[in-house]
From Swiss-Prot:
Further information: CTPSs have evolved a hybrid strategy for distinguishing between UTP and CTP. The overlapping regions of the product feedback inhibitory and substrate sites recognize a common feature in both compounds, the triphosphate moiety. To differentiate isosteric substrate and product pyrimidine rings, an additional pocket far from the expected kinase/ligase catalytic site, specifically recognizes the cytosine and ribose portions of the product inhibitor.
Keyword line: ATP-binding, Glutamine amidotransferase, Ligase, Magnesium, Metal-binding, Nucleotide-binding, Pyrimidine biosynthesis
Domain Glutamine amidotransferase type-1: 290-543
Residues bound to L-glutamine: G351, L379, G380, M381, Q382, E402, R469
Region (Amidoligase domain): 1-265
PANTHER family with a match to the protein in the record: CTP SYNTHASE (PTHR11550), CTP SYNTHASE-RELATED (PTHR11550:SF0)
Gene Ontology CC entries for this record: cytosol
Swiss-Prot/TrEMBL catalytic activity: UTP + L-glutamine + ATP + H2O = CTP + L-glutamate + ADP + phosphate + 2 H(+); L-glutamine + H2O = L-glutamate + NH4(+); UTP + NH4(+) + ATP = CTP + ADP + phosphate + 2 H(+)
Regulation: Allosterically activated by GTP, when glutamine is the substrate; GTP has no effect on the reaction when ammonia is the substrate. The allosteric effector GTP functions by stabilizing the protein conformation that binds the tetrahedral intermediate(s) formed during glutamine hydrolysis. Inhibited by the product CTP, via allosteric rather than competitive inhibition.
Pfam families per UniProt: CTP_synth_N, GATase
Organism of derivation: Azoarcus sp. (strain BH72)
Protein role: Catalyzes the ATP-dependent amination of UTP to CTP with either L-glutamine or ammonia as the source of nitrogen. Regulates intracellular CTP levels through interactions with the four ribonucleotide triphosphates.
Sequence positions that bind Mg(2+): D71, E139
Protein's recorded name: CTP synthase
């Protein structure tokens, strides 16, 4: 029978519930417990796919093509569990499902209400997502006290009763602010947050207290007394310079032992040696490289969460410190590429919209002409093709139809037809809805023999995750290949271009991929493409300093 750990948050948002939940999952998994994670988002959007990165941050794509919250990326990076459409749902999805049932007559003429119909639907979604796991760690988005979260909190309250006390554990993450004028951490916000939770009918079993300094013993006892939890269940979550230190931090305070005791689980001792080794690699690099990250949302790095982590993973696996320099592509448009001169490698990530594209193209041209290692992801690959078409193949006005509908050389165009993972043909047009209509999820890619891509992956066939509407235009691809562009990866059914590169005698390391390899990178194994990219940056750094 699956047991449940519910994680809620109070006082303020952005305290790190996702990291806390993922870290707990990592510790429990190290004890031989099969875990899964769910994220319950209280917004009315059906999914975050059409939300602005400034509003939501990164959209994480699962193997089965779900556009989900970035916390699912943390879950996959910290544990071996693979997330799917069942692991993230929103108020919008719940209401949509209930309304469809009402239209079909499944409620037999009853008045459809938040309680019981919405809460019952939430519970059924939670149980479906938790199937097959020993422990499901369920994170409830938002902050206790928000109106939007109430149906979710009521649903998990009911599950606490229905599943039984030994099958549920409630963890509440809260904030202990330090007031310099008073010279102490303040517990009152935590007390009020727990009071609010208890008024809903949920008594937390464990408190995770975010703080910038250690919590004195007398303050812990005070929190325990007034929040009705055991003193050992008041656990401090101190600010850390790496999220990968959090599992060890929580294990040292016996969080996993308290959870296992509450759930009646007998399990072997935790083994966090993998995490300890990763931290050692992170803190003892043998060299450093400087990577130019040329993007549009560089003031909000949460928009590129998985990509930043993938670069950090590559650093761990190459014993190097990766210094990421976030460069606004619009600033490059205005001021030129001088800022790139001291960089060991250049990366252009995915993105949408015309703003800043010419700055990205200028950075790509600089990488190609100066033989700087280059990695282009999604839009970064498309713009690499545009730059090659313009500056090498003689197609001076080449562009993507996403940005210039009337371009005479549409080297990038809308994908109108492709095969999904099951082989089903998907079709789209310019008039299709924005939400859920991209080429999404895991897709097979065939790699050409003798290419850098084939060497990097060590395999002729790979599976990577996609999120895009536009692709390289096959009708113009042959002309680009004649001029020296190497198509190193193709989709086996539709022949869509998935990877491009430059020959080794032209450039030491220049790769573009239509997919998002960052979604499958994790700290334990890294990802071959990012590891090879950082190695190329190290080689350039050594040669330039040589």
């Amino acid at each position: 029978m699956t047991k449940y750990v519910f994680v809620t948050g109070g006082v303020v948002s952005s305290l790190g519930k996702g990291i806390a939940a993922a870290s707990l999952g990592a510790i429990l998994e190290s004890r031989g417990i099969k875990v899964t994670h769910l994220k319950l988002d209280p917004y009315i959007n059906v999914d975050p796919g059409t939300m602005s990165p400034f509003q939501h941050g990164e959209v994480f794509v699962t193997e089965d093509g779900a556009e989900t919250d970035l916390d699912l990326g943390h879950y996959e990076r910290f544990t071996s569990a693979k997330m799917s459409k069942r692991n993230n749902f929103t108020t919008g999805q719940i209401y949509e499902a209930v309304i469809k049932k009402e239209r079909r007559g499944e409620y037999l003429g009853k008045t459809v209400q938040v309680i019981p119909h919405i809460t019952d639907e939430i519970k059924s979604y939670v149980k479906r997502g938790a199937e097959g796991a020993d422990v499901a760690i369920v994170e409830v988005g938002g902050t206790v006290g928000d109106i939007e979260s109430l149906p979710f909190l009521e649903a998990i309250r009911q599950m606490g009763i229905e599943e039984g006390r030994n099958a549920t554990c409630f963890i509440h993450l809260t904030l202990l602010p330090y007031i310099p004028t008073a010279g102490e951490l303040k517990t009152k916000p935590t007390q009020h947050s727990v009071k609010e939770l208890r008024e809903i009918g949920i008594q937390p079993d464990i408190l995770l207290c975010r703080a910038d300094r250690s919590i004195p013993a007398d303050e812990r006892r005070k929190i325990a007394l007034f929040c009705n939890v055991m003193p050992e269940a008041v656990i401090e979550c101190l600010d850390a310079d790496s999220i990968y230190k959090i599992p060890g931090q929580l294990h040292d305070q016996m969080l996993d032992e308290i959870v296992c005791h509450k759930l009646g689980i007998l399990a072997r001792a935790a083994d966090l040696s993998v995490w300890e080794n990763l931290i050692r690699a992170l803190e003892n690099p043998k060299q450093a490289v400087d990577i130019a990250f040329v993007g549009k949302y560089v003031d909000l790095t949460e928009s590129y969460k998985s990509l930043i982590e993938a670069l950090n993973h590559a650093g761990m696996h190459t014993e190097s410190k990766v210094n990421i320099h976030y460069l606004d592509s619009e600033e490059i448009e205005r001021s030129g590429c001088a800022v790139l001169e001291k960089m060991d490698a250049i990366l252009v990530p995915g993105g949408f919209g015309k703003r800043g594209t010419e700055g990205k193209i200028a950075a790509i041209r600089y990488a190609r002409e100066n033989k700087v290692p280059y990695l282009g992801i999604c839009l970064g690959m498309q713009l690499a093709v545009v730059e090659f078409a313009r500056d090498v193949a003689g197609m001076a006005e080449a562009h993507s139809t996403e940005f210039e509908r009337e371009t005479p050389f549409p080297v990038i165009g809308l994908i109108t037809e492709w095969a999904d993972r099951s082989g089903k043909v998907e079709k789209r047009s310019e008039d299709s809805d924005l939400g859920g209509t991209m080429r999404l999820g895991g897709q097979v890619c065939k790699l050409a023999d003798g290419t850098l891509a084939r060497e990097v992956y060590g395999s002729g066939e790979i599976m990577e995750r996609h999120r895009h509407r536009y692709e390289v235009n096959n009708t113009l691809l042959a002309q680009l290949e004649e001029k020296g562009l190497v198509v190193s990866g193709r989709a086996p059914v539709t022949d869509l271009c998935e990877m491009v590169e430059l020959p080794a005698d032209v450039h030491p390391w220049f790769v573009g991929c239509q997919f998002h390899p960052e979604f499958t990178s994790n700290p334990r194994k890294g990802h071959p493409l990012f590891t090879a990219y950082v190695k190329a940056a190290i080689a350039r750094h050594s040669a330039s300093r040589g």
